[in-house]
Amino acid sequence: VTSDDKQKNLELLQATAGMTANQRLVVMLYALHPTDRGGAVVETAANLAALVGMSAPVFSRTRKQVIESGWLEESDKLAHIRYYRLSPKALGVNVVVPLRRAT
């Protein structure tokens, strides 16, 4: 883990200051967990819940709250399993492309 990565994680932790402890834990889990090329955490909710010591229902409910607040977004769906990734908002990425005048 580079110094830049540590700084980004600290900034993410600071940005989640208004959230509940469980919500922050879910956001940080998605920030720190290995991802696929698209940034998705390819792991079931039950396995992720076990990693942070939550029951699966509490984890799923908390993750739903985090999704609704815009911190996570659905990345992939395989059969009935949905995979999520941090949203551009969480990563501090500006996805709005400035308009330019037509020539």
Which residues fall in each region the model found?
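Conserved segment of winged-helix/HTH DNA-binding domains
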Residues: 88-103
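Winged helix-turn-helix DNA-binding recognition segment
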Residues: 22, 33-91
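Short recognition helix of helix-turn-helix/winged-helix DNA-binding domains
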Residues: 1-51, 81, 99-103
